[in-house]
């Protein structure tokens, strides 16, 4: 299973707050996305577990520990997952859970609560007709489990009887030996081999394929409903949409007998419910398969066994500490695949050399540097902190980031690469192009000005003579905190001299994303003839998400004097057509990333990485 333990209620709140800070999508750390699926909010709504101000205040007094348990990670469609709490005060915690469930019943007329029997126990099951609420609540002593999956509720009760506990497995005991409790991780995550095998099994795989088809059918039906409404055609049911030519004649025919339904609660699947809140995969019984499904699974299974064979258990530990008076946070992350199967180890070991516990000392002026020990070579390199050429702005933004002839591209390849102790390996293709003998200081070059310098133990190449002159005297080894075969160091990119150009490029990307959302809304108005004020909501219904302006603005409908109107973003109204960001704009990761140190090691028993990330906390 998937197991994520927090160790305390405070850590659990930090995890939730971090997700909320980035719109519930960790990918927003790299670049702001144009659509939010609100996955964290969806999960809380479905489980009927909302964090209140009072709960935050007294949560630590009521909850000793918390964990996420699941059997897959299909969050956009609806994952099989639950929240497990160890209560300090079971009466207080249980009362709060029951209070939230009573409030949900009052607020949702279609919601109902029933007592279902699971493992000879009465379990509270709260559900709504559209599947948006689906919550099993069961307690055993001080352990309280809230889940959207009957299968997981059953597993919880089985474990309470001592049957099939994760903690009893040899793999998990090995994981905890590698990452023991005394590390005091903020978050500990474990993905077992059994979870991967279960997800690759026939029932799970086939139902996963079916639910993807069900989601596609719902989206198609929503588009058909919009088209019929704007054309004034009947659209009270799917049959009318088929007769009107908005859906194909064979629409909705699926092997398991499920179908798309257009009813009082919108468009949903007859077996799985509303899109984004689908019934968890393990709760949908696969009773029979078609020949085409069997053939498709056979192809998948053959590919899986040939390419993956066995996915090793994955464990991760995350710890954090505040820096700079609470203005920054350093996050320590350890990730391991262990135990490592021989096939994976042999493949990687054939590429890598033996780990050692020395590293290249930081080179002054490097924005990024790496060091990797290969089979017969130690390769290192760096990218220097430099300002863009003074005429880069005149070349246009795409030209400025490197889409130029070689004569200008070299101005942006401002770095170096080298090796140690004469073994050229991958760099031999550069060495063969050297046409001049080394001078007294070890410099030589090709006809196209690729420079090489042989300095002490090091052989270093660059497109720039001055880089070799700056870097090579600084090259030396120093003790490393851990043995490793790969090391990566990245400085504070917000202070990099290339940061303004990077911010400009990221602003342009974000601006295009915002404009892309507006084009979609415009298409709703022009092609489907959706009324202007309703066009954004219609687009969000089709996408099953919320359109977000990555520039930080809000989408707004503006009416014209002639009676029409258009959609725009308040941020775009302020910036206009300019391609340069406003003074207060700082795109991710420039807004938060302040440094990274990473190292990785391969041994016969494990593949592991350790990273330390410095993050700027929002004001």
Tell where the protein language model's regions lie, with residue ranges.
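Signature of soluble extracytoplasmic/periplasmic domains of secreted precursors
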Residues: 1-619
